[in-house]
Design a protein with these regions (language model features):
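Unchanged
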Residues: 1-203
Length: 203
């Protein structure tokens, strides 16, 4: 499990949260955990943070390995944003902000805890690969519905109204269940022009 952070200070908070959970047996001890701040203290966004994760994985394996990702199942949670809308969580980041749910042991849950629980069924569905999540959106799905028989990259998406979708990322289907275009935070008009909106006004 790899978390990304915007800077070293945020990364230290994330590391302390993970260490606390490990010491209290609230995370699997045989899983490797890493927290990677944006390189050189410069904000690189989710794309740059993903490349940073890939570099980290390659460096862990050394230069002799042909494919450093072979046989690995990696969960990346991008969590390097500032908590501007909820500044009370800017220190610990949105990822460790509480959610209105009590865990079986009686403690309050956080987005991070929900991600770990929700994604725990994914490794059994894939032999190897990397699942990338946005740390401020709790996406719940049934891992049994994942079709892991693919090459390259795959995306998990949900149908949503265009009024919601225009504020997020929208995949344009090529008609054969492949992504032909990714439209990020586009106007409703542009989404309609591109053919991304169906007859029910959903994307």
């Amino acid at each position: 499990i790899i978390l990304t952070a915007s800077n070293e200070a945020q990364a230290e908070v994330y590391r302390s949260q993970i260490e606390y959970r490990l010491q209290n047996h609230r995370l699997p001890a045989d899983t490797h955990y890493a927290v990677l701040p944006d390189p050189e203290g410069k904000r690189v966004g989710s794309g740059g943070a993903t490349f940073n994760v890939m570099r980290y994985i390659a460096q862990q394996e050394g230069t002799d390995v042909g494919n450093p990702f072979k046989g690995k199942r990696i969960l990346v949670i991008h969590s390097g944003g500032d908590s501007k809308r909820v500044p009370q969580y800017s220190v610990c980041g949105k990822l460790f902000s509480p959610v209105p749910r009590e865990l079986p042991d009686g403690r309050g849950s956080t987005l991070f805890d929900e991600f770990v629980i929700g994604m725990s069924g994914v490794p059994s569905r894939i032999r190897e690969g990397m699942l990338i999540l946005s740390g401020d959106v709790l996406l719940l799905f049934n891992p049994l519905q994942i079709d892991a028989m693919f090459n390259g990259a795959a995306a998990i998406s949900i149908k949503e109204s265009v009024t919601t979708g225009k504020n997020h990322g929208v995949f344009l289907n090529d008609g054969h269940d492949q992504v032909s275009l990714f439209l990020h935070k586009q106007s409703e008009e542009h989404l309609r022009e591109m053919g991304a909106v169906n007859e029910h006004s959903c994307v």
